[in-house]
């Protein structure tokens, strides 16, 4: 299948995770995940995601940036996309949050997935097969 034939045909294969978590104010992580489950037609168990990401039971308005990132990362589990485009996926995560991300990311790669990542923490990604698009003078990856 040639990408130039119909680029929109690949849209369902790509999942984007941005630097800023865009979450609906006034909702709890459970409510947000239930919405995403329905949107992505996922059979994931909400309570399992809440437990895996150690998400709080209060509204996102009261969450720290790290908690907000964890909520947004839970969405990757529901997307069922072959290609992930990730912008600073580990920024604002504590050590436990980063380990949870790496566990999810490793599962994605082992299942045949691909990730395109913009990061200031390249060493973590270099444990996988990596193609570096550009490296900044201070050894930082740059696209």
Give the role of each language-model region.
Residues 1-9:
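ABC ATPase NBD Q-loop/coupling interface
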Residues 59-68:
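Conserved ABC ATPase signature
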Residues 73, 112:
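Hydrophobic anchor residue at the start of the ABC signature
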Residues 84-88, 93:
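Catalytic Walker B motif of ABC-type/P-loop ATPase nucleotide-binding domains
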Residues 13-16, 20, 25-42:
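Q-loop/switch helix immediately C-terminal to the Walker
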Residues 95-97:
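Helix N-cap at the start of a conserved alpha-helix in ABC-type nucleotide-binding domains
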Residues 43-58:
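Conserved ABC ATPase "signature" region
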């Amino acid at each position: 299948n040639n990408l130039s034939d119909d680029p929109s045909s690949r849209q369902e294969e790509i999942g984007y995770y941005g630097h800023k978590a865009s979450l609906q104010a006034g909702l709890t992580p459970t409510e947000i995940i239930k919405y995403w489950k329905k949107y992505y037609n996922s059979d994931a168990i909400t309570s399992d995601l809440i437990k895996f990401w150690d998400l709080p039971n209060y509204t996102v308005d009261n969450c720290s940036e790290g908690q907000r990132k964890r909520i947004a990362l839970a969405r990757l589990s529901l997307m069922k996309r072959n290609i992930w485009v990730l912008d600073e996926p580990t920024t604002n995560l504590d050590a436990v949050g980063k380990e949870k991300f790496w566990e999810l990311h490793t599962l994605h790669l082992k299942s045949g997935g691909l990730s395109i990542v913009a990061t200031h923490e390249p060493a973590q990604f270099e444990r996988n097969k990596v193609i570096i698009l550009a490296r900044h003078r201070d050894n930082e990856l740059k696209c």
